[in-house]
Swiss-Prot record:
A Gene Ontology cellular-component term: cytosol
CDD domains, per the entry: LysRS_core (cd00775), LysRS_N (cd04322)
Protein known as: Lysine--tRNA ligase
Enzyme Commission identifier(s): 6.1.1.6
Primary enzyme class: ligase
Reaction(s) this enzyme catalyzes, per UniProt: tRNA(Lys) + L-lysine + ATP = L-lysyl-tRNA(Lys) + AMP + diphosphate
Subcellular location: Cytoplasm
Record has Hydrolase as a keyword: no
Cofactor(s) annotated in UniProt: Mg(2+)
Binding site for Mg(2+) 1: 420, 427
GO MF term (any one): magnesium ion binding
Principal subcellular localisation of the protein: cytoplasm
Organism placement in taxonomy: Bacteria, Bacillati, Bacillota, Clostridia, Eubacteriales
InterPro entries: Aa-tRNA-synt_II (IPR004364), aa-tRNA-synth_II (IPR006195), aa-tRNA-synth_II/BPL/LPL (IPR045864), Lys-tRNA-ligase_II (IPR002313), Lys-tRNA-ligase_II_bac/euk (IPR034762), Lys-tRNA-ligase_II_N (IPR044136), Lys-tRNA-synth_II_C (IPR018149), NA-bd_OB-fold (IPR012340)
Amino acid sequence: MGEKQLTKEEIKARKMEAKKEAEFNALVKERMQKLENLQEQGKDPFDVYKVERTHTSQQVKDNYDELEGKNVTVAGRLMSKRVHGKAGFSDIRDRYGKIQLYIKINDVGEEKLKEYKTFDIGDFVSITGTVFKTKTGEITLHILDFQLLSKSLKPLPEKFHGLKDPDLRYRQRYVDLIMNEDVKETFMKRTAIIKAIREFLDNRDFLEVETPILSPIAGGAAARPFITHHNALDIDMYLRIATELYLKRLIVGGFEKVYEIGKNFRNEGIDVRHNPEFTAIELYEAYADYNDMMEITENMVAYVCEKVNGTTKVMYEGTEIDFKPPWRRITMVDAVKEYAGVDFNEVKTDEEAREIAKSKELELKKELKDCTKGDILVALFEEFGEEKLMQPTFVCDYPKENSPLTKKKRGNDELTERFEGFVYGREICNAYSELNDPIVQKERFMQQLKERELGDDEAYMMDDDFINALEIGMPPTGGLGIGIDRLIMFLTDSSSIRDVILFPTMKPTK
């Protein structure tokens, strides 16, 4: 068979692409030639090691009254250049913003002006100049001297078109940060959010700790792990899927309030809410229960939101969300009754629950015959209730089958003292009254091993050392985990988790 004939539009698009590539290559060649010329003149910009700048762009603007008429030195990336004839304007950008530059032949001389004109957008320069305001009131530096610090050998995307392709933005985040100020703002806010979380917990006398990322057992969550091999020990090891079991060991050891902010790794799919490598916080408090964890969650999130946004209210994808405490509390049984129309208080057996699953045509994670009443309760909530929870809501009292590390509900042996927090129909946190009975914990792990044998590769592994720690004795404890990336999505109105992770996981290009 012959090759498929291209349409006129496809031919035109290919020609345009070829033209753009040729233009790009010509610009790269031109910049390489400029670098060679500089090197021949003994002005290699890559031989510059350090710059003594006196001010940032923002400091010049903030202190204009005292700096007017004085000389300062700034440094940054050249973002625009409008120099024609004997004078002109430019802009450079540093971490804090942009500042305008004005150059004139009378101040720098003909040779220096000629050199300045050879600079390209994207080059790094240092500028020494006098601070003044233009007739339009813009704070500007009147250039007296300059130095090329680094040569940009590839042109930046066009100013007005910018870097729009999301895939390319994620792969080349360094270019994305240069071209899109709002992206830089998102990541500045990310840093502020994590700082505020630490501040909140430190003020409550929590101790920040670090636990292993490599472990012989993947525990603390229902997830598929990444596996690696330790050559010296000749054993397979796992990248952690959660920090839970190590942090609880520290509660056993006498650290009564601990937290860890760090990376977890789960060998699962990638979508707008999931990245295989993600940041989470887990915290544990001795002598506390899941009610205390609700109080910490709602107050911490409200504190962080107000700290970085000035209010507990945010707009997320056009919906106003208010994180002000107290958040709504509803049991999973009541949520299923409200949103699925099924009263699980009346469901007595697994078989009755399976009949309900059939009638609702539920999608289940395992075969119907292997599903328990608790499995079906959770599936009904996920199918009918989860996406309805737009405002911050704690869904409480999960079935024990789905919560192997959790204490049973006081007064109900079928349920556990566990909650998950939901916002905009999405889970952002998970918390328990932690199970501290080593005998029951071992039984729960054994049940999870049976689940693994049935094909559930996300079921928990047996952790004998953790059982040993519980046998030494762990006090009643409340525990909480929050997905920091998802929280940041809400506080920055970001629709994809990739928009709040600097370098998200991407499929390699060929």
